[in-house]
Amino acid sequence: GGIEKSLVTLLSLFDYDRYEVDLQLFADEGLFLDRVPEQVHHLPSLFPGEYRKNIREALPILLRQGHPLIALCRLLVTFAGKTRGEMGDRLYRMWRIEKHFVRAPKKEYDAVVAFMEGQPIYYAVSKVRAKRKIGFIHGDYGAMGLNADLDRRYVARLDALCTVSESCRAALCKAFPGGDAKFHVIYNIISARFMRQMAEASADFGDSFTGPRILTIARLSHQKGLDLALLAAMLMKKRGYAFRWYIIGVGPEEADLKLQAKELGLSETVVFLGERGNPYPFLRACDIYAQTSRFEGKSIAVDEAMVMARPILLTDFSTAADQIDSEKNGLIVPMTPEGIAEGLQRLLSDGALRERFTAALSACDYTNEGEIEKLYALLEGKPFPAT
């Protein structure tokens, strides 16, 4: 996912002559594990990788491996995750169970960084002994459905809480009045040189289609609005537009989305490519990049599409304008199937518009590796650099 990719990019830039870094994962799984720099000391995970599997797969495997208590934890967490409430309520209920099954580190640290909302922040605050505690939230706190009443006690014990855009910082200020001084913006770090090198590989779309290609990179979840994308694709197909829409990613709604695509008659029009460790050749080869999310923080996939100078369409989620200046370097459209369809139809029909957006994006340098200095300042208890 985007957060994991952001973390790996951050770790790849760290000054290991200056810092010793331990990496604590909840479970050893993920597409980017092999990209963690060798200088990082990878601690044993809090749970086996199987813990993250679907409960029907996880339970028998954990029991066979001799982890009855972890199997019990996984079962209880499943029930907690299915109860009513917004995401923040569920994360908190899950942590109230998991905290009894996870160990605390033996040593004390100069600083701990919890790189994600929910359990990582709860763990860092509750279990880790450190002189400075820093949290990250990679989205719009309110739009994500997090619960300020539940999180307030944890936020109070952080020395800094970072997020990825000014809009996201404003959401934190609204959720936690009076906490402005500890809320900081550290943008997702982009290395354009690395991306362009990776993009030189071939893009295997798995077909011989020669028409316009639309690409989306997203977790297959409700947040990403892919159900809206499929309805938009149906409208465009009915109107006679020739295109293929490729989706890179996996997630909890994969089966439902594939069934929806089949029922809408889109089995050949929409192609699910699954997980791809290197999405950059696909970005280079696509004609349009579309992000149809219901909410985002500052989408890493959109940042990457900007670096690759692809014409971009975004739905009007709360932070969309933090990334795209609509009509100047992309389109921001209503968060409806009709809005998405009309925007994509404009891009498909107007080559000059696509070229204008590509030229505007190509004129900018999105590399921002200097953002890491902001984190260094927080780690060392120094004043946060002015932007």
Where are these regions (language model features)?
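Aromatic "clamp/platform" in nucleotide-sugar-dependent glycosyltransferases that forms part
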Residues: 275, 294
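A short hydrophobic beta-strand element within the catalytic core of glycosyltransferases
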Residues: 289-290
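A conserved mid-protein helix/loop that constitutes part of the nucleotide-sugar donor-binding site
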Residues: 4-9, 212-235, 241, 252-258
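A short, well-ordered alpha-helix in the C-terminal region of glycosyltransferases
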Residues: 269, 282, 339, 346, ...
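Conserved acidic donor-binding segment of nucleotide-sugar-dependent glycosyltransferases
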Residues: 326-327, 331-337, 346-351
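Donor nucleotide-sugar binding/catalytic pocket of nucleotide-sugar-dependent glycosyltransferases
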Residues: 132-138, 142, 156-198
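Short acidic/histidine- and often glycine-rich active-site loop of Leloir-type glycosyltransferases
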Residues: 304, 317-327, 331-332
